[in-house]
Amino acid sequence: MASSACFLLHHAPSTPATTSRTPSHRLVPTIKPSQLICRAQKSSDTDENSSTAVSRRLALTILIGSAAVGTKIAPANAAYGEAANVFGKAKTNTDFLPYTGDGFNLLIPAKWNPSKEVEFPGQVLRYEDNFDVTSNVSVTVTPTSKKSITDYGTPEEFLSTVDYLLGKQAYSGKTASEGGFDPDSVATANILEVSTPVVGGKQYYNISVLTRTADGDEGGKHHVISATVTDGKLYICKAQAGDKRWFKGAKKFVESTTTSFNVA
């Protein structure tokens, strides 16, 4: 680091070199102006080292600031009851496991176990809840002469041809009209929701049904059915849960499982 020093120089008066003088002329000295001279001086090594250290610290500060501005920080979002994702990494959904069958795919709740029980004709898959077998999912594949699911008619008409999917009650016989059931009837089914999406060029029927039986202790069962036709086969995925568990979280697993059902 350089510094400057200034010096003020004074010049002595000067007189003409001639020796001839006349009495009528007075000697007037010639005065030159003072000069201010500034000379650059090199500071000591200590100043240089201090300057170098300051420069390095300044460069490092600028570098860190630039890196912070240029870095994209993902928000640490978290839902209630979940840990914050402080590093911005994508979280893996561990609630479901992918399953690939013969010509179809779906997601199955991770805590459900495979079951050997065969409940429906053409059943190729069954998983059930570890703690409540009422909550389960099954896939059936049966031959059909239909070219499309729409050949069965409306979703309601299709459901009437596969009403065995809704289960059977333990009692049958003459009954009085009570508990909301018709006379001589111990079971009832109500269609709650119907949709007809097209996925991968294939028409699907998605039907949500609530059934109640006189011998049931769950207050009813929620059934969600997804069905389609391809290559001369009728594919049906049905998941269900008891009414009590439905409102305690089972709804998420039942609906997500049937929604994920996809036929190749």
From Swiss-Prot:
<protein>
    <recommendedName>
        <fullName>Oxygen-evolving enhancer protein 2, chloroplastic</fullName>
    </recommendedName>
</protein>
<keyword id="KW-0472">Membrane</keyword>
<keyword id="KW-0934">Plastid</keyword>
<dbReference type="GO" id="GO:0015979">
    <property type="term" value="P:photosynthesis"/>
</dbReference>
<dbReference type="GO" id="GO:0009535">
    <property type="term" value="C:chloroplast thylakoid membrane"/>
</dbReference>
<keyword id="KW-0150">Chloroplast</keyword>
<keyword id="KW-0809">Transit peptide</keyword>
<dbReference type="GO" id="GO:0019898">
    <property type="term" value="C:extrinsic component of membrane"/>
</dbReference>
<dbReference type="InterPro" id="IPR016123">
    <property type="entry name" value="Mog1/PsbP_a/b/a-sand"/>
</dbReference>
<comment type="function">
    <text>May be involved in the regulation of photosystem II.</text>
</comment>
<dbReference type="Pfam" id="PF01789">
    <property type="entry name" value="PsbP"/>
</dbReference>
<dbReference type="GO" id="GO:0005509">
    <property type="term" value="F:calcium ion binding"/>
</dbReference>
<keyword id="KW-0604">Photosystem II</keyword>
<keyword id="KW-0602">Photosynthesis</keyword>
<feature type="transit peptide" description="Chloroplast">
    <location>
        <begin position="1"/>
        <end position="78"/>
    </location>
</feature>
<dbReference type="GO" id="GO:0009654">
    <property type="term" value="C:photosystem II oxygen evolving complex"/>
</dbReference>
<keyword id="KW-0793">Thylakoid</keyword>
<dbReference type="InterPro" id="IPR002683">
    <property type="entry name" value="PsbP_C"/>
</dbReference>
<comment type="similarity">
    <text>Belongs to the PsbP family.</text>
</comment>
